[in-house]
Amino acid sequence: MRTVPFVFSLTALACAGQRSGQAPSPRAAGGDTTQSSSLGAGAASTPNANPFPSTYRPYPARTTVIRNASILTAAGPLIQSGSVVLRDGKIAAVGASVDAPADAVVIDGTGKYVTPGLVDTHSHLGVYPAPGGQALSDGNEATSPVMANVWAEHSVWPQDPQFPRNLAGGVTTLQVLPGSANLIGGRSVVLKVVPARTVQGMKFPGAKYGLKMACGENPKRVYASRGPSTRMGNVAGYRSAWVQAEQYRRRWDKWNRDHQGDAPTRDLGNETLAEVLRGNIFVHNHCYRADEMAQMMDIAKEFGYKIRSFHHGVEAYKVADLLARDSISASIWSDWGGFKMEALDGIRANLALVHRAGARAIVHSDDPSGSQRLTQDAAKGMAAGNAIGIRVTDEDAIKWVTINAAWALGLDSQIGSLEPGKNADVVLWSGNPFSVYTRAEKVWVDGAMLYDRADPSEQWRTDFELGFVPAQRGGTPGRNP
């Protein structure tokens, strides 16, 4: 038995990489074979639009069948005593009765549940890593209210020990955002929760970037002495930034069309905002109050961009019909509220009311501990809705942490539900995932089992934790929680 379970060591990886002719280790970091653009068809109008491409490479996977489990697919009704087949990194089959390939590893899921891998739309893992401290506090570039030129991925520390703890909670994909100090905080990045030496080795291939924007109290507080110091100052700041970005986009579009004279001077901030205007980057907007969400929708219409998701949104229930009308998702908590003035009107039925209105409700975390318990937060939102007469089923609530969140990241065709052809991001739970007594037992990413609660050798530890000696319990090596 290994003293240090599932050690992901940079030194070991570097040495392994020097052995010519050898295949990468099953636990080696993502290689450099997959380079995938994060921008869409309009990206050609931005020079070098993808300078930091994903180098993620799936880990070796074995054909696996989980039998006799209750399956919440996030695409239909609960399947009782069903089976899921994982093959070649994809969901090969799911249903009440499926054939098991002869070479498959068969897992008995009697009394257990299977769900898609969880998706967290709002994380700061890696940019505010553990242990907390100023030396590792890299989530807010609070030097100007508009910082569209910064990219969260350039602050992500892949050795953050919170990553493996999120995997142990069933999270397989997350969006890391800049903080909310600024009106425009910079680009977000979508990561797979996998061991890697670099952030590029974690980047979800082909995932679009996001733009973090923030309303309300946080920018006011941070910039009170420099401005903006009021909500009307905030709005003026957004609009000024978009005016400049639109002018920048037109200059580049004209040059790309005519190729006359010298190319316009590049500006990293306007480059990001121009990609939003072209539809290549999603807007993720930190916003608590209903009136401010409505104002941000108006600004988006003024400048012709789309808001993909409002984050936190404790008053989303007040404008749920507007969210549904404009196809804007709400990435929200189950029961956080009242902790500052703009959160005063938070209610526990927020998720259920957004869901009833036909908008996409999403449970997000904004917290390294909460992201380990996303299904428990979904359970609280489900209970609050049922308590006021809004029927929310397990089949509804699982979507709040899977397919709806995947949609907010533009990845719902690849992840977020258990359907043939989708990525085999799968969680086997010890019981109903909405119970506080349930734990994730096994977690697969692209068909590779990267977490096994019962086997310390299949539990990822970052380099930061090398040298950690598990506690001894009754003379046997302890296991990670």
Map each language-model feature to its residues.
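N-terminal pre-domain segments of enzymes
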Residues: 18-61, 469-479
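Histidine-rich, glycine-flanked metal-binding segment
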Residues: 48-49, 53-62, 71, 75-115, ...
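Divalent metal-coordination and catalytic microenvironments
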Residues: 69, 84, 89, 111, ...
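Metal-associated gating/positioning segment near the N- to mid-region
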Residues: 112-189
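C-terminal motif of bacterial Sec signal peptides marking the signal peptidase cleavage site
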Residues: 13-14
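C-terminal cap of metal-dependent C-N hydrolases
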Residues: 69, 407, 419-463
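Polyanionic/metal-chelating signatures
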Residues: 162, 167-311, 439, 445, ...
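His/Asp/Glu-enriched, well-ordered alpha-helical/loop segment
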Residues: 55, 60, 130-131, 137-143, ...
